[in-house]
A protein has these predicted regions:
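Histidine/acidic-residue-rich, glycine-tolerant segments that coordinate divalent metal ions
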Residues: 6-26, 32-33, 45-177, 262, ...
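DPxDG-like acidic metal-binding loop motif
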Residues: 35-42
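Metal-dependent amide/peptide-bond hydrolase catalytic core
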Residues: 140-356
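Structural motif
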Residues: 1-2, 55-57, 84-88, 250-251, ...
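Generic recognition of short, well-ordered alpha-helical segments
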Residues: 40, 68-72, 130, 197-200, ...
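Non-cysteine beta-strand/loop elements that form the S-adenosyl-L-methionine
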Residues: 2-5, 115-117, 275-281
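Loop/helix-junction capping segments adjacent to catalytic residues or to phosphate/diphosphate-binding pockets
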Residues: 35, 67-68, 229, 304
Length: 356
């Protein structure tokens, strides 16, 4: 059996309230902790390699937050014709007490889509707004429609969230700008029923509101719905048993689904996968602030549990006869890239890049 272990490598630009001893860096989202777990688990597994049958691949993914690194890693694995049985990843979480392994089955992290849109009106002087066409008016209409989209177009029983994180226009107090740019994201679990419906409905809303306000609209970025993370049921059950044996019942909990998104979803559509959370919340040490917040920090002692549980689970998996369900895009990476709306030229460039 072949079992890849995942870690993500990235730095985030944040105000550094919780600083590292290394100038200019901080945990930010815990990816350095993930890397520490992966490297230490690898050392342990190497020391006990005679105790299990199979191979383990360590995968270090660059740029997870930007979503630009996974495609090269997947293409590399595909180009080497590596036959993978299952994948595993771990992510720190302030939602659970320090050292707790939170394990969930089925949909565990949401899929997402991102948008970056420019509205073009007509500029003018602030003293003569009637001679201009303020793109802000159009945006207000769009935002109002967006706020009611959830209630009017979707069942309350279908989990979804969306938000606008950036709005940019003008920099003069007495000048009406000719354009406004806004950016945001949307999250879901049911890609077909919810993700694609929002994709179509929100796009129609933007176009119709722009026409009504005599504005032009440019979809600088409007991604197709990306995939949610789906945990294999049998892998989840095995991890529950394995990690409970290793850490005890007090340190293994059932994970609640999260509306956060992660590029590990792309692996979970290639191979049976397991994505678990490692609690880092410790009030005495001041850890427990939200991911990506400037006060985020982690209790580094939690990494000991993460490492021990990871190594134990890998050994138990490789020595098991567990049955795993095939995933939709197993051995079909090019089809997967096409489903992500990538052109043939872009796909070829991905494969060429990994050979340079």
């Amino acid at each position: 059996m072949l079992f890849p272990l995942m870690s993500q490598i990235i730095t985030l630009s944040k105000p550094r309230i919780v600083k590292s001893k290394n100038e200019g860096v901080m945990h930010a989202c815990g990816h350095d902790g993930h890397t520490s777990i992966l490297l230490t688990a690898a050392r342990i597994l190497n020391e006990v390699k005679d105790d299990f049958a199979g191979s383990v691949i360590l995968c270090f993914e660059r740029g997870e937050e930007s979503g630009k690194g996974y495609k090269y890693l997947l293409a590399y694995l595909d180009s080497k014709n590596i036959n993978i049985d299952a994948c595993y990843a771990i992510h720190v979480s302030p939602d659970y007490k320090s050292g707790v392994m939170a394990i969930g089955a089925g949909g565990i992290n949401a899929g997402s889509l991102a948008f970056d849109i420019t509205i073009k009106g007509n500029s003018g002087h602030g003293s003569r707004p009637y001679e201009a066409n303020n793109p802000l008016d159009c945006f207000v209409d769009i935002y109002s429609g967006l706020k009611s989209l959830r209630m009017n177009n979707f069942s309350p029983f279908d989990p979804m969230t969306y938000s606008i994180g950036a709005v940019q226009m003008g920099n003069k107090y007495n000048q009406i700008p000719d354009k406004l740019r806004f950016r945001g994201s949307m999250r879901f679990f049911d890609r077909e029923k919810v993700g694609y419906k929002f994709y179509e409905d929100f796009k129609s809303l933007i176009i119709n509101k722009s026409k009504a306000n005599n504005c032009k609209v440019i979809f600088d970025t409007y991604t197709k719905p990306r995939f949610p993370i789906i945990n294999d049921l049998n892998l989840s059950a095995l991890a529950l048993t394995s990690m409970t044996d290793e850490l005890g019942e007090d340190f293994v909990k059932e994970a609640s689904p999260s509306m956060g998104s992660d590029t590990f979803a792309t692996y979970s559509y290639q191979w049976p996968s397991l994505y678990i959370m490692l609690g880092i919340n410790n009030e005495e040490k001041g850890s427990g602030a939200a991911l990506h917040s400037p006060k985020f920090d982690l209790d580094e002692k939690a990494l000991i549990h993460g490492t021990a549980a990871t190594a134990r689970f890998v050994v138990d998996f490789l020595n098991s006869d567990i049955e795993l369900a095939d995933r939709p895009y197993k051995n079909r990476l090019r089809d997967f890239f096409i489903e992500e709306d990538r052109s043939d030229e872009e796909i070829e460039d991905i494969y060429e890049t990994i050979t340079r």
